Amino acid sequence: VMLGLLLVAGIGVAVLLGPYALRVEHVAAEPRTGFHSDYYLYVPTTLHRDERGNATLLVQPNNSGRTSDDIGAHRRDAWMTGFERKRIADELGVALLVPAFPRTARDWRTYTHALDRDVLTTRDRLLARLDLQLIAMIDDARARLRKDGTPVDARVLLQGFSASAMFANRFTALHPDRVRAATIGSPGGWPIAPVAKVGVDALPYPAGIADLSALTGTPFDAAAFARVPQYLYMGDADDNDSLDFNDGWDKPMSAEVDRLFGDTPLARWTHAEMLYAQAGANARFELVPGVGHDRKALQERSTAFFREVLATP
């Protein structure tokens, strides 16, 4: 009987995981190509094509929710993230890329999964400039698909929630020319402001974009950023605030954000919305009544936004 139950359970797992497991490609790190971590690429059976015949790539940054020096733990989490987002890729008819970036315990202050300031300054090649590593992954995935006869838009759909929303939001500010549209769910208490200062107060990265040139060698491209359709959303009962922790923010900078804009995610929300409007951003902000820090309750809003974007030439 026990053997029979195990067999049934095994078949159930195979049926559940099968459609994703059979189609997902595990791409190993390729430092010479510019990425030091693995990624997962899932291609649904049917791909939506734009008017130029290009398919689209949806990028979902990984977020393990914890530090670990075991890269296998981050890979397993990234694989499961892809499995959970498979339905979205199928619905939209887009390929799905999930990086397996590590978030190490040995260097816990470098909050890789949120693309924090330390990621732009560290000398550790595994963790450094994950924005550029992700671009290398995107271009590697595009080359693989092109080899199979599927040209892919250089601009991606980018979505995230919590830490991965911080990554998606900050990546969009760093590389707006590579983003077709972005959905940003509960971005850690403060989305990056697309301005250099508020009044006389400078807003360095990741509070704002004041020192992007010094950090990256490339100035903020305000015109390209303004062209990216963005949807920023949060439950009005969400009190998840990355500014309270030392891994993602330097204390003086988080204190400055608290002083200027309020000390809770909800208090800061309208300030962020106003700064995006003043910068001419094509950004829709939405507070969802009665919802806390709940990705699954809010995912359909992100999917619907992308559906709208894909339907627009």
Where in this protein do the model-derived segments appear?
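A domain-start/cap signature at the N-terminus of enzymes
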Residues: L5-L57, G65, D69-I71, K86, ...
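Short amphipathic alpha-helices and their capping/turn segments at secondary-structure boundaries
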Residues: Y40-D50, F83-A89, L212-Y231
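Alpha/beta-hydrolase
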Residues: V59-P61, M234, V288
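Active-site machinery of serine-nucleophile hydrolases
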Residues: S64-A141, A272-L275
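Short glycine-enriched nucleophile-adjacent loop
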Residues: A165-P176
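The feature captures the conserved acid-bearing segment of alpha/beta-hydrolase catalytic domains
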Residues: A181, S186-A279
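C-terminal catalytic histidine-bearing segment of alpha/beta-hydrolase fold enzymes
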Residues: A267-P313
